[in-house]
Amino acid sequence: EIKISGHVPDPIWYITGKFEKDGSFFKANLISVIHNSSDTEKILSACKSQRGTIDNIVKFDKIISPPTPFNVSNLQKEAYRIFKMSPATTFSIAESLYLAALISYPRTSSQILPPSIGYKQILERLKMNYFQTNENIVNDILKREYLAPYQGKEEDPAHPAIYPTGIKQKKLNVLQRKILDLIIKRFLSTFGNNAVTKYSEVTINVNGYYFLAKANGILNKGWIHLYEPYFSINESNLPELKISEPIKVNEIKASEDYTRPPARYNQANLLDKMESEGIGTKSTRAAIINLLIKRKYIFQDKNGIEPTELGFTIFNTMKKFVSEIISTKLTSSLESSIKKIQEGDLEIGDLRVYLEKALSNPINEFKLNESTIGNEIKNVLTSFENKMSIGKCPKCQKGEMILIRSSKTKKRFLACSQYRVTGCNAMAAVPQKGLIKKDSTCHCGWPILHIMFARKRWWTTCVNRICSNNRYNIAHHYDSESNALI
């Protein structure tokens, strides 16, 4: 987030050419990115009304191996990619499927399915209970003389990778059906053959400037047809071309853009980052993210995960006084040591000695500055909880609509900051739960809020109770003292 806020966008230009061969059109991009408008104009002028020449052609077949069986981390990341489902929700659903005997134990780090689980028996049950109308999908696998799923590298001595039991499903909700279907199709795809694609790359010389066109086509779907619709390849084609062959340039155009800051994390790639930094385990990482959201240290919207003011303050305060405690190196070292203890490679006593040595100075520093640290966090926590600017007051146009928590009722509501100055009595009720963020201004002049609840998606509402965009303008009661929803 610090890198994002410090990013200064620089203008860049992309140049694209539209080429033609025997009535077939395709696009190619200038290989280099241009950083000033004068060079852009120079290239456009140099390429205008010119013919291109095929400078180089690269073709090769690309083999795509089947996916590995799911461990809990892979399942969480895949469910987020496909369904935008949070890791915590995915894990909770997987546990419910396990308790219903529909899948194996989900809290596993293994990517290996041992023969002892009974490949054939599971496939037979899946065919009978889930593929009655399309038995050929499973029959093609069962016809093989030797059944062997594609295995991953990660092992868990306690549990195999996640797999479906094949038992007939009972009454499931929509999310449970989605996760179960994903697990079933992932299991089937591990028995699939390699997929094969044909990759083509053509370099075109236009008056000394080089454009690159790419194409990708499927030669053999292999395991992909077993995993559909959860994986697909965008196919594109190029006409038949030869090196040194002239080619018609139909159009050359430039588009201006700006350099972008690093993308914010989402819950899936944050899991990857935590894994690479050695923070948490496959079973605890989703819970850690969920806890940070619950405590309002971070929040997630459609743009990704962002730290709140409270989260930033805690980070900066701890970094200032006890940076060792928030070091990922210390956390990673501790997680590694715990794993060694589980595997019998380290004694608990040795870990205790290490921790006493590593944490001695940080703990002393913390105790020495405990009062200062507490006051800094307390101040921002009070500000964060009791006051948040939402936008201009629609009534007086002078004050700010701020989020206030009533000291008497403990309920929160919006009120004009000019109340004590001018007596402006503009107020609006807000939901008593959920993370609130301003979205935009409604046609009625009042703010539209973006609100996220635990395990629910974001939704929006105008805070003006008589506006048609207010989700609560019908059949809800308001507290007369605070004007808050009851």
Question: Where in the sequence are the language-model features?
Answer:
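Conserved phosphate-chemistry cores used by DNA topoisomerases
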Residues: 1-95, 100-102, 259, 276
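Basic, low-complexity terminal or inter-domain segments flanking catalytic cores
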Residues: 4-6, 87-88, 109-486
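Short Lys/Arg-enriched helix C-cap and helix-to-coil transition segments
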Residues: 106
